[in-house]
Amino acid sequence: MPKTGLDALLRPESSILVLIDHQPYQFANLHSHEPTMIVNNVIGLAKTAKVFNVPTILTTVIEERGGYLIKGLQDVFPEQKPINRTFINTWQDERVVDAVKKSGRKQLVLAALWSEICLAMPAIQALAEGYDVFIVTDASGGVTAEAHDMAVRRMVAAGAIPVTWLAVAGEWQRDWAREKTAAGLAGVLAEHGGASGVAFAWEMQLLAAQRSRPPS
């Protein structure tokens, strides 16, 4: 994958998203980030993928003990049953790998709990198999800040590209003239974009007011 230039950016038609182990057990020992932030961000990321019709794979690990996928995330794809694994490394589960290969897409976008294990393992393995791996660092987290940081450094050294969920959204949209997705993304940003979402909603309000103002 080129490191610079337009082709280095994410494209919705080339992307596939895999969301790994956003479950109660993992959240219980998440200490690198505020858990509510990760919940917000991963749901925002999932909704963004849905706006752009980016195939999304949901997967859990031993949900009988670790709990089901968090409800807000499952609600984005109510018809999809998460792939429940025994493998710690998602990329060793043939069902996940087969689904990715079947999509034909090479930009692999990953988010997981925890970063040092369930994000790092599949990221490093998929890189060796020729995928362009993008790790969504603010929709992932580790058991400590150091664990998350060391995991990100390790994956970057291996060739992964660190991104935030808003960066993913921006690269998929690229141009606000793309009306097919602009309105849907605007709704996601207003709900999950934090201060950026508030500012965006305010901008939309001002634009609407200008359009409705009678000519002088």
Model features per residue range: what roles?
Residues M1-F87, D149-V156, A160-P162, Q173-S216:
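Active-site acidic carboxylates
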Residues I43, E94, E116-A120:
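Glycine-rich phosphate-binding loop at the start of an alpha helix
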